[in-house]
Amino acid sequence: MAEMVARLASERAVVVFTKSGCCMCTAVTTLLGELAVSAAVHELDREPLGKEMERELARRLYGSGGRGGPAVPAVFIGGSLVGSTSKVMAMHLKGELVPMLKNAGALWL
């Protein structure tokens, strides 16, 4: 499953793993959309292997036990895991998100 998540996370400059109906997922994808980022979005509750991918994302976010909070949204920029909502929003407020998006080729501003 780790290889599958890695492959999907690298398919575009920005990849977001979400679940339908998740308000934090909507907040992150809305922010990226307002920044004119065309992210690949994978809704895990609509993926055949979504539960397994969610466990892998939790492991990546919170360590080997995979416990510590929700696994979605999980945001990858340039193939690297950035984090969840709090990390992405904090980076945006600090002015760090846009430069990272530019470096990954997700923005042309």
Swiss-Prot record:
Disulfide bond in keyword set: yes
Top-level taxon of the source organism: Eukaryota
Cell compartments where the protein resides: Cytoplasm; Nucleus
Cited CDD domains: GRX_GRXh_1_2_like (cd03419)
Motif residue range(s): Responsive for interaction with TGA factors: 106-109
PROSITE patterns according to UniProt: GLUTAREDOXIN_2 (PS51354)
Alphabetical list of Gene3D superfamilies matching this protein: Glutaredoxin (3.40.30.10)
Alphabetically ordered keywords of this record: Cytoplasm, Disulfide bond, Electron transport, Nucleus, Redox-active center, Transport
Family to which the UniProt record says this protein belongs: Belongs to the glutaredoxin family. CC-type subfamily.
NCBIfam families reported for this sequence: GlrX-like_plant (TIGR02189)
The name this protein goes by in its record: Glutaredoxin-C13
Annotated organism of origin: Oryza sativa subsp. japonica (Rice)
